[in-house]
Amino acid sequence: MADLRVILRKPTIADGDEFINAMKASRRFHRPWVQPPRSAAAFTAYLKRLRIADHDGHLVCLRGSGAIVGVINLNHIIRRAFQSAFLGYYAVAEYAGQGLMFEGMQLTVRYAFRRLKLHRLEANIQPGNSASIALVKRCGFLREGFSRRYLKIDRQWSDHERWALLAENWSAHDTA
């Protein structure tokens, strides 16, 4: 993992301007898949949500320059018998297609399974989002099903494919 081009780090209020500018510049790229925070108030609300026990999130940043290339969140972390979380993620358009989110996802999966001791990660992806589906496939996620009108995005209910990765399946592929 030492040869990765990215690192994960927790977002802070100091990231606000860079984050907001990156999300505004990526608006077309994100539509219709996701609506990340694009204002100071929305970014502050995002930071506040990450302080809740069942949410965790990281910026994916270039090693060296620290530029934000994406975001990966672990949402609705459920403990006890479930030990699971739902992934949410998005790239900054300028850095898309370079494999950087794949590297960030590798680090996130490692963090979730090793540090947080989760058993299952789930990603719910709109069927037309081929880049996102390719990312989770490359990371070892398996398609488990289809959820009709699963999530409301941009004021419309959207169908999603359900993809999941279990800790025991990941550990067989983890070489670091």
How would you describe each model-predicted region?
Residues 34-37, 54, 78, 95:
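Residues at alpha-helix boundaries and short interhelical turns
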Residues 28-47:
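Conserved GNAT-fold acetyl-CoA-binding loop/helix
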Residues 48-59:
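A short helix-loop-beta-strand connector motif used in the catalytic cores of GNAT acetyltransferases and
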Residues 1-18, 22-27, 61-176:
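Acyl-donor (CoA/ACP) binding surface of acyl/acetyltransferases
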Residues 46-49, 111:
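A generic secondary-structure signal
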